[in-house]
Amino acid sequence: MKTTRSESLFAEAQSLFPGGVNSPVRAFRAVGGTPRFIARGEGALIFDVDGNRYIDYVLSWGPLIAGHTHPDVVAAIAEQAARGTSFGAPTELESELARLIIQAMPAVEMVRFVSSGTEAAMSALRLARAATRRDKVIKFAGCYHGHFDGFLVQAGSGVATLGLPDSPGVTAATAAGTLTAPYNDLDAVEALLKANPGEVAAIAVEPVAGNMGLVLPQPGFLAGLRRLADEHGALLIFDEVMTGFRVAYGGAQGRYGITPDLTCLGKVIGGGLPAAAYGGRRELMELIAPAGPVYQAGTLSGNPLAMAAGIATLRIIGAPGVFERLEQATAALCAGFERAAADADIPLRAAYAGSMWGFFFTGDPVVDYASAKKADTRRYARFFHAMLERGVYLAPAQFEAAFVSLAHSDALIQETIAAAADALRSL
């Protein structure tokens, strides 16, 4: 596979950007080799600057549930761009997208748009602290809520990939306000609440963990968090930046039937453009300025291009049968990977929720960050490159989720499974 153009561009990029990239995982540090520079996308496919074609399971890290360059999304962006790209003033598009979100998620009675998942999580925590008049937050080891200082403790995603326990620059005082528990461990959460009586403002969780690889919530875990939050006067924050409109149209809260106090959204709601949001009960959201005293603002919040792309995307995936088709494709993919691994006598466990999926090279159950870290990351790196050579683009790190789009046809799913079988035999 020819990669000379990507190699040349990456060499130049390293003189322009820290590590040659604008988000760490893109640098291929966890798997080695040269990042592919992408020239264009079409449906479920991406093409790099050297002309190589790949079936894409990264999908811009989740937003592109309709696939690359879906004609409805492209048309919506083009039509809005012709009218204006940004106004810094209210638009009807903001209200239209907000209504779609509120209709899909009963826990969200009001919403505030921001431009990134980090902003959404940061703002939701500030609101929770103001509402409860408490300072501490419980998060879960390996869960990632953006690069805000208060959540950058035992974080997942690129932090996990780079093996950083925490980030330099986060003050000890800030870190002290962030309590961590193992994912899926209700006893640990209860112990933290009892050890910090009246001090915990919120429990923040990825309802399906997607930043330590994909780890599913154990039966009763999310319901247990709801119960513990209620018993101890804390708010429950679902970070659905990844799971919202991805594991079900109504997100993880709809899939599992749990009602959080606050919800963070991103990725899918922007249709591939920078958009995120946080929302919740009316009495909480009315504490946000200018209705209330909790300040939050943003120059590009509710940007009309992103709103247009988000509306088009939610209309596409809101059609009958969409999530059934997505889940069937994802289930087939996971079953195919496990079958291919078994045939190659290689331990592999795959899991999925909706159109979000992942796998670990291990024979043991993966229920939290500690068990995820026991998986064979060196084998993952070899498998990643073997798949890349066979035209399949997976996440360049073990500790990331993968995604399926509406553009992933049965033929592409079977092509991927065949590539995986061949790649596994080569390891």
From Swiss-Prot:
The alphabetical list of record keywords is: Chlorophyll biosynthesis, Cytoplasm, Isomerase, Porphyrin biosynthesis, Pyridoxal phosphate
UniProt keyword Cytoplasm present: yes
What top-level class of enzyme does the UniProt entry assign?
A: isomerase
Give the E.C. number(s).
5.4.3.8
User: Which InterPro entries does the UniProt record give?
Assistant: 4pyrrol_synth_GluAld_NH2Trfase, Aminotrans_3, Aminotrans_3_PPA_site, PyrdxlP-dep_Trfase, PyrdxlP-dep_Trfase_major, PyrdxlP-dep_Trfase_small
Which GO cellular component does the record give, naming just one? cytoplasm
Q: Which Pfam families match?
A: Aminotran_3 (PF00202)
One of this protein's GO BP terms?
Answer: protoporphyrinogen IX biosynthetic process
Q: Name one GO molecular function term.
A: transaminase activity
Q: Which cofactor does it need?
A: pyridoxal 5'-phosphate
Please give the chief subcellular localization of this protein. cytoplasm
List residues, modification N6-(pyridoxal phosphate)lysine. 267
Domain of life, per the record? Answer: Bacteria
Subcellular localization(s) per the UniProt record: Cytoplasm
Q: In which pathway does it act?
A: Porphyrin-containing compound metabolism; protoporphyrin-IX biosynthesis; 5-aminolevulinate from L-glutamyl-tRNA(Glu): step 2/2; Porphyrin-containing compound metabolism; chlorophyll biosynthesis
Reaction(s) the record says it catalyses: (S)-4-amino-5-oxopentanoate = 5-aminolevulinate
On subunit structure and binding partners, the annotation says: Homodimer.
Entry similarity comment: Belongs to the class-III pyridoxal-phosphate-dependent aminotransferase family. HemL subfamily.
Which PANTHER family does the protein's record reference?
GLUTAMATE-1-SEMIALDEHYDE 2,1-AMINOMUTASE, GLUTAMATE-1-SEMIALDEHYDE 2,1-AMINOMUTASE 1, CHLOROPLASTIC-RELATED
**HAMAP family, per this entry?**
HemL_aminotrans_3
Q: What is this protein called?
A: Glutamate-1-semialdehyde 2,1-aminomutase
Give the organism the record lists: Roseiflexus sp. (strain RS-1)
